Amino acid sequence: MDQDYERRLLRQIVIQNENTMPRVTEMRRTLTPASSPVSSPSKHGDRFIPSRAGANWSVNFHRINENEKSPSQNRKAKDATSDNGKDGLAYSALLKNELLGAGIEKVQDPQTEDRRLQPSTPEKKGLFTYSLSTKRSSPDDGNDVSPYSLSPVSNKSQKLLRSPRKPTRKISKIPFKVLDAPELQDDFYLNLVDWSSLNVLSVGLGTCVYLWSACTSQVTRLCDLSVEGDSVTSVGWSERGNLVAVGTHKGFVQIWDAAAGKKLSMLEGHTARVGALAWNAEQLSSGSRDRMILQRDIRTPPLQSERRLQGHRQEVCGLKWSTDHQLLASGGNDNKLLVWNHSSLSPVQQYTEHLAAVKAIAWSPHQHGLLASGGGTADRCIRFWNTLTGQPLQCIDTGSQVCNLAWSKHANELVSTHGYSQNQILVWKYPSLTQVAKLTGHSYRVLYLAMSPDGEAIVTGAGDETLRFWNVFSKTRSTKVKWESVSVLNLFTRIR
């Protein structure tokens, strides 16, 4: 607000108060008995008009509005994916420029805007100060309007209105490919879909394992366990993408060479079905209904380098190694999430906040030690943990059974698949936990999830016997020009 205009406004208010004071005094005299010893003021007002010229308007504006909305409304307000949300942010920034002199030249992300407005340290100055500001605006500030300008707004607002709009991110709600998957089991505790680093998808259908090449769309049958009287309960690719592990209902783990279609070994040790597999270089971890986790090196003879991890009281249904290959997270039907390391046979961390089976587990590739987990039907929550300190971070109720979790390789986002009762796929932004997209199409629980090696597409499987491919994430392509590379002083950009 202009200081001269503010002074004139305050002067008018003071004059009006002084003009109305005699009337108030006369009314008090008529209502007060003559014998009353209390006398009313007759010359001085009873109000102090504060001068807000020295106040921090941005901080005051944030403090006034920070408690107006509920947390759910704040979460919806932060979701700026729609055009109406972006228009509202631009309009709010324009009002701040004209009324508060904020000097905003481009529309910021709502989360960034909240952090910018919120002071990092407590303000020592009061909200109302009774002194005039000594700061004077200089012509270089860009807030003064040119005398030749016909625009009713300031220069900063003009730059704000001329700033290009950030392109809206579009996530298709229709899968770009749908494949039939007959006999795909509708079992929450199994893991029957995995995508290799060589762009080959493995799917366990009944007693067989099929391989589908995303490059050629060719389908091959890797193995058939009907001869052995067994069925497939889990599949998992090695990091190199040349080996695939197959867990069976009888408790065996078979190692297959995908290119040659040859079984290399069969690992024993479990007494019940193997529903979870996790590779760590040449080591393979398997979780079973017998409540046991076995770690084995496939390069050594069977049972020679076996490690038995006992910590769950019911079936182990989720296994994931951290991105640095140092920690193993396991989830079970006992509602527990356990974290293991290489040197101990007992869990180094134990989380019991979930109220249902923990199958969905995912380690963040962007933040060291950040672990996400999801609970079953009775829990419906996605929880985040700092495994470096052992402390819980955040929690969000999704409203339905959490079946799978996967982090994006290119952005700080994650995707979750759900069962009862929504049967949907959700994309979340972290750490704000705002929904980026909601995908529907499966008629049964979305029990299976795998991500493509380039990190842009995902495949989901459900009991409706279909595999659906979605384009969810995209690689960030920088379009900024580095001025040092085109500088005249840079000799490497010129012909010598």
Curated annotation (Swiss-Prot):
Compositional bias annotation for Polar residues = 32-42, 146-160
Signal peptide start and end residues? none
Q: What GO biological process, any one, is recorded here? A: positive regulation of anaphase-promoting complex-dependent catabolic process
Q: Where are the WD repeats?
A: 182-222, 227-266, 269-306, 311-350, 353-395, 397-438, 441-480
Q: Keywords on this record?
A: Acetylation, Cell cycle, Cell division, Cytoplasm, Disease variant, DNA damage, DNA repair, Epilepsy, Intellectual disability, Mitosis, Nucleus, Phosphoprotein, Repeat, Ubl conjugation, Ubl conjugation pathway, WD repeat
Q: Please give the residue positions where the record annotates the modification N6-acetyllysine.
A: 69, 159
UniProt keyword Zinc-finger present: no
**Could you state what the record's PTM comment says about this protein?**
Acetylated. Deacetylated by SIRT2 at Lys-69 and Lys-159; deacetylation enhances the interaction of FZR1 with CDC27, leading to activation of anaphase promoting complex/cyclosome (APC/C).
- Name the tissues where it is expressed: Isoform 2 is expressed at high levels in heart, liver, spleen and some cancer cell lines whereas isoform 3 is expressed only at low levels in these tissues.
Bias type Basic and acidic residues, positions: 76-86, 106-126
- Provide GO CC annotations from the record: anaphase-promoting complex; cytosol; nuclear membrane; nucleoplasm; nucleus
Q: In which pathway does it act?
A: Protein modification; protein ubiquitination
Q: Which Pfam families match?
A: WD40_CDC20-Fz
Taxonomic superkingdom = Eukaryota
Keyword Phosphoprotein belongs to the record: yes
Q: Which residues carry this modification: Phosphoserine?
A: 36, 133, 138, 146, 151
Q: Which residues carry this modification: Phosphothreonine?
A: 32
Residues of the region (Disordered) are 28-51, 64-88, 105-166
Which Gene Ontology MF annotations are present?
anaphase-promoting complex binding; ubiquitin ligase activator activity; ubiquitin-like ligase-substrate adaptor activity
PANTHER family in the record? CELL DIVISION CYCLE 20 CDC20 FIZZY -RELATED (PTHR19918), FIZZY-RELATED PROTEIN HOMOLOG (PTHR19918:SF1)
Q: Which family does it belong to?
A: Belongs to the WD repeat CDC20/Fizzy family.
Q: How does it assemble?
A: The unphosphorylated form interacts with APC/C during mitosis. Interacts with NINL. Interacts (in complex with the anaphase promoting complex APC) with MAD2L2; inhibits FZR1-mediated APC/C activation. Interacts with SIRT2 and USP37. Interacts (via WD repeats) with MAK. Interacts with RBBP8/CtIP; this interaction leads to RBBP8 proteasomal degradation. Interacts with HECW2. Interacts with SASS6; the interaction is regulated by CENATAC and leads to SASS6 proteasomal degradation. Interacts (via N-terminus) with CCNF. Interacts with CDC6. Interacts with TK1 (via the KEN box).
Could you say which disease the record links this protein to? Developmental and epileptic encephalopathy 109: A form of epileptic encephalopathy, a heterogeneous group of early-onset epilepsies characterized by refractory seizures, neurodevelopmental impairment, and poor prognosis. Development is normal prior to seizure onset, after which cognitive and motor delays become apparent. DEE109 is an autosomal dominant form characterized by the onset of various types of seizures in the first months or years of life.
What this chain does, per the entry, is described as: Substrate-specific adapter for the anaphase promoting complex/cyclosome (APC/C) E3 ubiquitin-protein ligase complex. Associates with the APC/C in late mitosis, in replacement of CDC20, and activates the APC/C during anaphase and telophase. The APC/C remains active in degrading substrates to ensure that positive regulators of the cell cycle do not accumulate prematurely. At the G1/S transition FZR1 is phosphorylated, leading to its dissociation from the APC/C.
Question: What protein name is recorded for this chain?
Answer: Fizzy-related protein homolog
